[in-house]
Amino acid sequence: MIDLSPLVRRLAGTPLACWSQGLQAQLQAKLEKGHGDLERWRGALDALPALLPSEIDLVDGLRLDCDCDDGTRAQMRQALMGLSPWRKGPFDLFGVHVDTEWRSDWKWSRVAPHLDLQGKRVLDVGCGNGYYQWRMLGAGADMVIGVDPNWLFFCQFQAVQRYLPDLPAWHLPFALEELPANLEGFDTVFSMGVFYHRRSPIEHLLALKDCLVKGGELVLETLVVEGDEQQVLVPEDRYAQMRNVWYLPSVPALERWLRRAGFSDVRCVDVSVTSVEEQRSTEWMRYQSLGDFLDPNDHSKTIEGLPAPRRATLLARK
């Protein structure tokens, strides 16, 4: 049983107080529906050793440590491996280095210098396993709620949270569509790596805006293409072997969409081509990764002949 009463207490007196009252029942209904692998993943969580971190670093990475013996480390490693594949990270947990598919710390180092999260109430949409939530706390956020309907990511978050139970981070296994309309309760809303999976991009921007307080900030990170404000790529079928990629706008086009959705102070703070060093297969994620999805003779193109992944981060104000 995951007790959300600390979250309810945290949200008392905020615009999110009313919403928080129904979260425990909403979570319980989701858990009862469950997932075929949930029991196995819960078994991995139960196998984690009971440890109290004496060192916690959420600023320069995500590292927890304490004095523990090799047997305990082996137990930790085996339990964490039971929650594979690990996509976002890396995590250093009591001497076990979880070398995830993505070097999410690289993305964070590109995005974080442009943000002021001090004292902010934050929503991370499509939060994955919560890696960025912990980094947001490290950057001074007052509290962070992540939503992502993927059950494995939910369990991976629980694995870290059991060693940081008093920190104000919560992962709810919900889709953005399961949040009420017009929440208007978050100072900062993140949508990183979600936008291109949405069939209706403007609707997504409007839904994100609805979650923000007036004057709140959106952090939008997504795949883009080069070009002017009329340039948008809609893949015929797959993009880098992904079926569920719909719209890859140019940065000027995306800036226009944000303004059209009612945002102001729109600006692009980073554009980076994703390298095979930043996204790759590892011991902790053994499936195919970016290197398998690019043209083997020309890494500037995907295997389908489309422009290789290029990601931009934009900030905008409600």
Swiss-Prot record:
Entry EC number(s): 2.5.1.-
InterPro entries linked to this entry: CmoB, Mo5U34_MeTrfas-like, SAM-dependent_MTases_sf
EC category name: transferase
Recorded catalytic activity of this chain's protein: carboxy-S-adenosyl-L-methionine + 5-hydroxyuridine(34) in tRNA = 5-carboxymethoxyuridine(34) in tRNA + S-adenosyl-L-homocysteine + H(+)
Binding site for carboxy-S-adenosyl-L-methionine: K88, W102, K107, G126, L176, E177, M192, Y196, R311
A GO biological-process term: tRNA wobble uridine modification
Disulfide bonds, paired cysteine numbers: none
CDD domains found in the cross-reference section: AdoMet_MTases
A molecular-function term among this protein's GO annotations: transferase activity, transferring alkyl or aryl (other than methyl) groups
Keywords recorded for this protein, A-Z: Transferase, tRNA processing
Similarity remark: Belongs to the class I-like SAM-binding methyltransferase superfamily. CmoB family.
Function field: Catalyzes carboxymethyl transfer from carboxy-S-adenosyl-L-methionine (Cx-SAM) to 5-hydroxyuridine (ho5U) to form 5-carboxymethoxyuridine (cmo5U) at position 34 in tRNAs.
Alphabetized HAMAP family for the sequence: tRNA_carboxymethyltr_CmoB (MF_01590)
The protein's name: tRNA U34 carboxymethyltransferase
UniProt gene name: cmoB
